[in-house]
Amino acid sequence: MADLSLELCGVKLKNPIIAASGTFGFGREYDELYDIGQLGGISVKGLSLKPRTGNPPSRIAETPSGMLNSVGLQNPGVDSFVENDLPWLLEKNVAVIANITGTSVDEYVQMAERLAPTGVHMLEMNISCPNVHEGGVAFGVKPESVYQITKAVKAAARQPLIVKLTPNVSDITENALAAQEAGADAISMINTLTGIAVDVRRRKMILANNTGGLSGPAVRPVALRMVWQSAQKVHIPIIGMGGIETGEDAAAFMLCGAQAVMVGTANFTDPFACPRIIRELNDYCDAQKVQNVQELVGTLKAY
């Protein structure tokens, strides 16, 4: 058996497999199927200051090798999470990552302040949200805005801050560097790629919001490339994600430079995906005679 444990931003994880935000709720449904305490961590459903009802249906569309979602960050609000879900989660002996969203820098700062005195282990800041003060342009598109929001939230946060980067940019490494320079403790990538689904018979969009976020195996080659490129530029930890379905997929991200990975869409197609991937990653390490999984990180060779 390989040693899968690691320390991420000062937080000890049993293994590098983390359930991705938006695909795992607050963990309760999955805990009915298996002990979620065996995971490395859980990034909970995206939280906002106030409850959000999300977008109208339809909100999900299946695509070849993936799915489009336009859920709209439906959630009960941060206060409800802290009062009703966090105490239960903290009993599960798993690293809890609070994924935070907002419509302004001030909202993100308030989220960090609200979560500061809680037992949450890390914050993951979703900066793919539109900035209402900048004409609706997402925070994560421009390096300048990535730097600004990261610096402000880092000043308010007590927990390590992970900045989740959008792939919908020309050069993701610029935003990775901006996050690092502003004080981010780690970056996670990639968030979903923007796409649409078309009903050709009705000649209509399938999603009520028109556009949605593409995830699943279809995005994996793009995600691997972006992790690999960013690992050449930054020295803070990278958490890789994008279409991970197997232990070898997880290993590929680590070879590209990720210290840990997040599993998202696979949780929908196989509710037991996370524990299975942990086993498969261990099997891969044993076959490769790797004693500690962190030996894989950044060892990808050029052709």
Where are the regions that the model predicts?
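Short, charged, surface-exposed secondary-structure boundary motifs
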Residues: 51-55, 197-199, 271-274
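Alpha/beta catalytic cores of nucleotide-metabolism and tRNA/nucleoside-modifying enzymes
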Residues: 214-235, 239, 245-303
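Hydrophobic faces of well-ordered beta-strands that scaffold small-molecule active sites
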Residues: 4, 17-20, 40-44, 96-100, ...
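Structural signal for hydrophobic packing residues in well-ordered secondary-structure cores
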Residues: 93, 119, 154-157, 281-289
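Flexible loop residues that form catalytic
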Residues: 22, 47, 128-130, 192, ...
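Short, surface-exposed connector motifs at secondary-structure boundaries
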Residues: 11-14, 91-96, 156-161, 232-236, ...
